[in-house]
Curated annotation (Swiss-Prot):
Marked site (Stabilizes the basic form of H active site to accept a proton) residue numbers: D91
EC class of the enzyme, as a word: hydrolase
Record function comment: Hydrolyzes ribosome-free peptidyl-tRNAs (with 1 or more amino acids incorporated), which drop off the ribosome during protein synthesis, or as a result of ribosome stalling. Catalyzes the release of premature peptidyl moieties from peptidyl-tRNA molecules trapped in stalled 50S ribosomal subunits, and thus maintains levels of free tRNAs and 50S ribosomes.
Residues the UniProt record annotates as site (Discriminates between blocked and unblocked aminoacyl-tRNA): N9
Subunit structure: Monomer.
InterPro entries: Pept_tRNA_hydro, Pept_tRNA_hydro_CS, Pept_tRNA_hydro_sf
Example of a GO MF term: tRNA binding
Keyword tRNA-binding in annotation: yes
Annotated tRNA binding sites: Y14, Y64, N66, N112
Organism of provenance: Rhodopseudomonas palustris (strain HaA2)
This protein's name: Peptidyl-tRNA hydrolase
Gene name in the database record: pth
Length: 207
């Protein structure tokens, strides 16, 4: 059994924010794989199903980003699972838009959702890092992640959510590198990883 956590902030005010791309991917997994209806528990919303024969619970913490760890800890405690069975899908400003990387453990790079989760369950969980680009200067990061995806960005966001959801069974099976590779190749094939498309809208990619 594995716990897939999507990070974001609750409410319509935030639903299209870059910070909410974790929610978006988790929602797409539930839709595309016929998971159960969402229900309120563990200080969030959960949906149950299976990916490639592996039992999965999806969790969207409704605590707001900075307290996401409380919901994750409650769910992990209920299911008696360790860090190794937790995968967290989150926005990553250090990656160009549409880029995906997967890693276990490591730093939190200033991400308050990851900071909260690490404080509650430890640091050695899987992170699925979903690139949303960097605004170019540190002072603009807050407004960037809490800003909505631009209209020009929506095609790659939709494609990334669909492709990540279609290949999520690889994460369920522990094939993290294969997941990242398949997502990269599929996004590249759709033309979303071309150099001239990495700089979505007026955003600059951090060097």
């Amino acid at each position: 059994m594995r716990l897939f956590v999507g990070l974001g902030n609750p409410g319509t005010k935030y639903q299209d924010n870059r910070h909410n791309i974790g929610f978006m991917v988790i929602d797409e997994i539930a839709r595309r794989h016929g998971f159960s209806p969402w229900r309120r528990r563990f200080q969030g919303e959960t949906s149950d199903g299976a990916l490639d024969g592996e039992r999965i619970t999806l969790l969207k913490p409704l605590t707001y980003m900075n307290e996401s760890g409380r919901a994750v800890q409650e769910a992990a405690s209920f299911y008696k699972i360790g860090q190794g069975e937790v995968a967290v899908f989150h926005d990553e400003i250090e990656l160009p838009p549409a880029k995906v990387r997967v890693k276990v453990g490591g730093g939190i790079a200033g991400h308050n959702g990851l900071r909260s989760i690490s404080a509650h369950i430890g640091n050695d969980y899987l992170r699925v890092r979903l690139g949303v680009g960097h605004p170019g200067v540190k002072e603009m990061v807050h407004g960037h992640v809490l800003g909505d995806f631009a209209k020009s960005e929506r095609p790659w966001v939709a494609a990334l959510c669909e492709i990540a959801a279609d290949n999520a069974g690889l994460i369920a099976k522990g094939k993290d590198a294969s997941f990242a590779n398949k997502v990269h190749l599929a996004m590249q094939a759709k033309g979303f990883l071309d150099e001239d498309k990495k700089k979505s809208g007026d955003n600059k990619v951090a060097k």
